[in-house]
Design a protein with these regions (language model features):
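Proline-threonine-serine-rich low-complexity tracts
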Residues: 1-202
Length: 202
């Protein structure tokens, strides 16, 4: 059984419609059957099969037939899969336009952060990577490792010029979102006059 529901609490038998909420039992007027269940939840890292899967083990006991020697106890595993096609959303990231006053025409070390929200995964189930394209020439000079959380934060030295940072986040269902941030570092140090010793003018 596959559902497009992300909250495990909404998959409780009391919240499901027949025939998914409990076993369908048939018996005689003298039967006294009762059903109980136990869940085991499994996450999938790539989301190809499902966001997560619940193996719900139903146990049915007939008190009229219950005997440790002869039976009266039956079990069945119900497989519940959760799929989701909605990718996480990255909050808008402002482009940066910064000034460097370094006398040697150096750049700046800046702090970066991207934040995402998702309707199907908690913060710990979001995975991030980011890529740095120096000079914005479609070539990535740096690719980060993977990190998890509701946000990704890092500090990085950025040289003078126009650059691009690409953030990618995905959740346990395998859907991903990409957001770009443009970064411009300008040389804002004004020119300074220098005296040349031994030079005179009339």
């Amino acid at each position: 059984t596959t559902f497009d529901v992300c909250e495990i609490d909404l998959l409780d038998p009391d919240d499901l419609q027949p025939p998914y909420n409990e076993p369908v039992l048939s018996g005689g007027p003298c039967d006294m059957a009762a059903a109980t269940h136990e869940d085991a939840v499994f996450d999938f890292s790539n989301g190809d099969q499902a966001c997560f899967k619940i193996l719900r083990t139903w146990t049915v006991m007939d008190w009229c037939q219950m005997n440790t020697q002869t039976g009266g106890l039956w079990s069945h595993i119900q497989v519940i899969k959760v799929m989701n096609s909605v990718a996480p959303e990255i909050e808008p990231i402002a482009d940066l336009d910064e000034c460097s006053f370094d006398p040697q025409c150096g750049g700046l070390t800046l702090d970066f952060e991207a934040i995402a929200e998702d309707d199907c995964s908690g913060p710990g189930a979001l995975t991030w990577k980011y890529y740095i394209d120096e000079n914005n020439d479609e070539t990535f000079e740096y690719t980060s490792g993977q990190s998890t959380g509701a946000s990704v934060e890092f500090s990085r030295y950025i040289p003078l010029g126009d650059h691009r940072i690409v953030y990618t986040v995905w959740h346990r269902c395998g859907n991903n979102t990409t957001e770009e941030q443009l970064v411009t570092i300008r040389n804002c140090k004004p020119p300074s006059a220098k005296c040349i010793h031994g030079l005179s003018t009339n």
